[in-house]
Structures are given as structure tokens and as C-alpha cells.
């Protein structure tokens, strides 16, 4: 994939993610459903779509063979499915329910800054000037958003801030953890299985509702 294509896909993904937040906010005002239900339905429907794409690309058969040869890979898929996919979506929708889509999206997009800090600690090196600038701008932007420039008050509910930061942190995890899985599985198969696992993990909670 070319650098231009990668940048284009990242921009498209970010735009669609923000649009889904706006749609979720509208959904909450028009229905009695709660974030955990929306998350589960979204995961199951997305999983079905990605299974079709995996079948179309030939990755479904290869993925099943890999799991038969090494069933322990299901543990890694479960970790990514729950921590890297399910929680990032659930916390994002919870942030929107507690606050609004705009604030949740902006706070959640501190994930690149979190990744820079993680990699700096992981590789024991100082961030570059550009990376440092990214962290400073991200933190300053969130500070202005949540305080409105007044340190003595919050313009965004604390619950929204917490859920949004959880979403950002788990999104960072989702970008780092599955690198080794992408070497083993087709990307469509990986997403299909992990989204299915994430949806199943929510069943005990949604059945109680």
C-alpha cells in the first residue's frame, strides 16, 4: 500500500469514527437503548460483514486452518477482541451518553499522544521534537476543551472525560497489540473473529438488562 493510500484511509477512518459518534448521540435521543446494547449490535453486524469479506478474500479458510493448528491463538484473539475492540467502542459510546459526541471524539483522539508516550517508555528514548509537539498540542487542546480556559470548572462532565480517556487508551492498545496477529491472519478474518468475541463477551451483561 502506498503512503498516500494509507493516509487517505486513516483520514477516512477518522471521519467515519466521528460520524458514528454523531449518529450514536442522535440514536440516544430517539430511543431507550443504552450504549452496551448499541455496542453489541454494532459488533455482531460488523463481524458478519467482515466474515463475508474474509470469505471473499480467501482469508477465512486460511484463518480457520491457522486456528486448528494453534488453538492457543484464540487467547490472543480474545484479548484483542475484548480490550482492543469491544472496550474501545463501549467506552466511546458511554462517553457520548455522558457528554456529547464532539467532546468524546476530541478527548479520545489523544490516543496518538498516548502511543508516543508508550513507545518512548517502551524503547527508552525521548520523543522527537515533532512527537513532543504532538503531545503538548493534544494535552493543551483537551485542557481547553474540558475547562473552557477556566481551571476552576469543568465544561465537560467528568464521566464523559473518564470514558473518553478509556476509549483513547484502549484505542492505543488496539493499534499496538495486534501487530503479531496481522502477520498470522488476514485482516478481515482478524476483525471478524475479534468483533464476534467482543460481542459475545457482552452477552452476560445484555441478558441481564
PLM features: residue spans?
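Glycine-/small-residue-enriched transmembrane alpha-helix faces in small-molecule transporters
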Residues: 1-40, 153-180, 188, 200-204
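Residue-level signature of transmembrane alpha-helical cores of multipass secondary-active transporters
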Residues: 6-14, 76-81, 93, 105, ...
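Specific transmembrane alpha-helical segments of multi-pass solute transporters/efflux pumps
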Residues: 16, 58-102, 144
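Hydrophobic/small/kink-forming positions within alpha-helical transmembrane segments
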Residues: 18, 22, 44, 51, ...
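Hydrophobic/aromatic residues within transmembrane alpha-helices
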Residues: 27, 38, 42, 95, ...
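Structural motif at transmembrane-helix junctions in multi-pass transporters
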Residues: 30-37, 90-108, 185-188
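C-terminal transmembrane-helix exit sites in multi-pass transporters
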Residues: 49, 54, 111-136
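Hydrophobic transmembrane alpha-helices of multi-pass small-molecule transport proteins
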Residues: 50, 127-149, 196, 202
